[in-house]
């Protein structure tokens, strides 16, 4: 079940109060009370998208799939940009194709809300180490290619608060970061490690850059919010000079293709990644199983790859 919106405003004070009580009940796993209170809020404010989303999620938890889908669909119709991640819930219950589940608006809202506590929760709570793993992999990949590990210009896709730039300090002459979340970018700006920061979707950002402009593109736990990585790979190859690296981590699953996990992230199969790398003009320099973070104390399986633009 995707995260609930942190707040909701319907324009009706009493409806907002009922919604707050409903969200509190949901957070306490009292789904029957949450559904009842959400219905009360919607009686007062029928066009309250967050109220429909909360009702749908409570009904899903109660096993009332048909009613839940109707409520979730109503929420999506009222707010098609979907910052609440309703599409994810619809995909999980089979009412929407998983490839269409995650929107830019959802990712932006999620990380705007997450930004103030992002590093503390991710690093201390989840033992996150994606940037360090990528930095180490780049050193090993450079050694395999008998080349210097230093890079003249790097693009950090989904840069977040700047953890990747810290891990690459002293390795890149210039680094630019891109992220959907302005609040994450505000945190990254405080590091003073970036030569430029851009608020944009990553494929659109790459498409606006010159061919051969960079010699490193990094994406630490960012592709988990994209189902189809084809455009990201193709645009990364285009902006890379010959011999440049694309290094990234993703979540893994044992099968083929791409699946949407219960954690509202995509997991990519090894064969999918290898086939796509070859199809988009990359040579796989390094590919290995890793875990970049934990979930409830257990390692989350993933892949780490360093690919080279060889032609």
Regions found by a protein language model. Give the residues of each.
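Helix-start (N-cap) detector for alpha-helical repeat units in TPR-like alpha-solenoids
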Residues: 15-16, 49-50, 83-84, 183
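Class I SAM-dependent methyltransferase SAM/SAH-binding core
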Residues: 153-155, 160-206
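A short glycine-rich, Lys/Arg-flanked "PGG" loop and its adjoining helix->strand segment in the class I
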Residues: 230-242
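Conserved beta-strand signature within the Rossmann-like core of class I S-adenosyl-L-methionine
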Residues: 243-251
């Amino acid at each position: 079940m995707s995260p609930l919106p942190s707040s909701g405003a319907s324009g009706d004070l009493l409806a907002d109060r009922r919604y707050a009580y409903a969200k509190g009940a949901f957070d306490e796993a009292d789904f029957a009370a949450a559904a009842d209170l959400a219905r009360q809020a919607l009686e007062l404010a029928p066009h309250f998208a967050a109220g429909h989303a909360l009702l749908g999620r409570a009904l899903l938890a109660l096993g009332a799939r048909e009613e839940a889908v109707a409520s979730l669909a109503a929420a999506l119709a009222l707010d098609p940009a979907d910052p609440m991640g309703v599409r994810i819930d619809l995909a999980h219950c089979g009412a929407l194709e998983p490839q269409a589940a995650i929107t830019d608006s959802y990712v932006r809202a999620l990380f705007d809300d997450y930004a103030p506590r992002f590093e503390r929760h991710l690093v201390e709570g989840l033992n996150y180490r994606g940037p360090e793993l990528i930095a180490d992999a780049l050193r090993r990949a450079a050694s395999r290619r008998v080349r210097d590990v230093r890079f003249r210009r790097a693009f950090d896709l989904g840069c977040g608060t700047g953890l990747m730039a810290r891990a690459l300090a002293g390795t890149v002459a210039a680094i630019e970061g891109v992220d959907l979340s302005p609040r994450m970018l505000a945190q990254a700006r405080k590091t003073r490690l970036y030569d430029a920061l851009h608020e944009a979707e990553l494929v659109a950002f790459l498409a606006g850059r010159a061919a051969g402009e960079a010699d490193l593109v990094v994406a630490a736990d960012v592709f988990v919010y994209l189902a189809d990585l084809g455009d990201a790979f193709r645009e990364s190859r285009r902006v890379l000079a010959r011999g440049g690296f694309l290094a990234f981590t993703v979540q893994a699953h044992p099968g083929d293709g791409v699946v949407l996990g219960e954690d509202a992230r995509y997991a990519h199969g090894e064969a999918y990644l290898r086939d796509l790398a070859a199809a988009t003009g990359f040579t796989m320099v390094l590919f290995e199983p890793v875990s970049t973070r934990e979930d409830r104390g257990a390692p989350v399986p993933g892949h780490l790859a360093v690919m080279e633009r060889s032609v």
